[in-house]
Amino acid sequence: MSQMTKIFISQPMNGKTAEEIENERNYIISRLATHFPRAEIIDSFFKDTPHDAKPLWYLGESIKLMSEADVVFFCNGWQTARGCQIEHDCALEYGIDTMYEEDLIS
């Protein structure tokens, strides 16, 4: 039996509503299922956050979750999203496999 693959999704969120973020995320998850039949998606969309949470708080929490991932998946637009860029640097520096939305074109 194949091993479960833990996937962290790095997704630009600035300027998007919670609904837009969740819709994009659900679409990506459905596409990932064809590449990873035994995938566990690490939930990194924070719904219950401190009311005064700053962007760096979210990034810190995301990096903690990312440490559990086998693969970090980068949604389109990650190159211009500050948090996604930092997550990308962390994945590369710490040897976590990366995958990009353009990889799902097939």
PLM feature spans:
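Conserved catalytic or regulatory cores that recognize and/or transform ribose-phosphate-containing ligands
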Residues: 1-106
